[in-house]
């Protein structure tokens, strides 16, 4: 059975994390958020400026686009789980490096294990390559 306390524990660990140098430059680590029993999980690259300020995923410009996409698909933020490959904003919004992705990989794995979604939507190149390693999703 999925428990809120398990995700709450992971979220606390993320907020206190000091595994890499991003903890020096961040304002807030940004754990995933949403329905702990979601059938659909969205995984982005990393927090942006607004996410870093408020500690919540996808609340800036990308969040507005995601909200529109969710609405068009008949979904709501409360029905899905939203997270990122890395949990802290890289300086100047640069692409996360391999060390940063590796340091956050256990957090993401734990989130996915607890939520156990039926569908995982990868948002952008970083999440695609981090999860699938560049493998083709479908063949024509």
Question: Which residues fall in each region the model found?
Answer:
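Short, conserved active-site loops that position catalytic residues or coordinate cofactors/metal ions
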Residues: 45, 84-85
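The first long alpha-helix at the start of the GST-like C-terminal all-alpha domain
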Residues: 61-80
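Solvent-exposed, flexible loop/coil residues
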Residues: 24-26, 33-35, 62, 79, ...
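Active-site and ligand/interface coordination hotspots across diverse enzymes
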Residues: 1-61, 71-72
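Glycine/proline-rich loop-helix segments at beta-alpha junctions forming the active-site rim
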Residues: 77-78, 85-140
């Amino acid at each position: 059975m999925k428990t809120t306390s398990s995700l709450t524990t992971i979220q606390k660990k993320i907020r206190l994390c000091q595994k890499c140098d991003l903890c020096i430059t961040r304002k807030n680590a940004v754990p995933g958020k949403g329905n702990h029993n979601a059938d659909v999980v969205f995984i982005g690259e990393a927090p942006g400026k607004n996410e870093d300020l408020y500690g919540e995923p996808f609340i800036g410009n990308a969040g507005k686009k995601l909200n529109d996409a969710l609405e068009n698909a008949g979904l709501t933020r409360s029905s899905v789980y939203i997270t990122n490959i890395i949990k802290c904003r890289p300086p100047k919004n640069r692409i996360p490096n391999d060390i940063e992705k590796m340091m956050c990989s256990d957090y993401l794995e734990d989130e996915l294990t607890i939520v156990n979604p039926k569908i995982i939507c990868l948002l952008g190149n970083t999440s695609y390559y981090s999860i699938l390693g560049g493998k083709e999703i479908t063949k024509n």
